[in-house]
């Protein structure tokens, strides 16, 4: 899901709200991410639900992507109130969750937007190794944006519930209230 206008035309930027994605089977090859919000998030993105989805393959990318579920904020939009529920992951070779605010080649707005109130519930990894998960905010000499209020409830790897950040292989930087 993207939220940007035509190149160089900010008058076409629109908010993305009240999107319900459900009962999907997803296969992701290199490059990219299976369920992705971003890059190009220049407006407000909120009240999204991803529910009852099966990610059957998410290939190793070796760069910035390769996640089963990602939010990549490279612009100034505010991403909030997003729910991921009842998602089964059969194969995630690189990352399970990848949530970050960053400056990259896709950036069109200098000021960075926020990511907050993101909820993961009943996410199951069914096969393979436990992939790493990343949550990272943004810091420059003039700006700091922290990712905050991210919840994980009932995340399991091959039937074993993740009780700690270590179980989830979660790495955080510039993030609060995880």
Model segments located where?
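Extracellular/periplasmic carbohydrate-active domains that bind, remodel
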Residues: 1-178
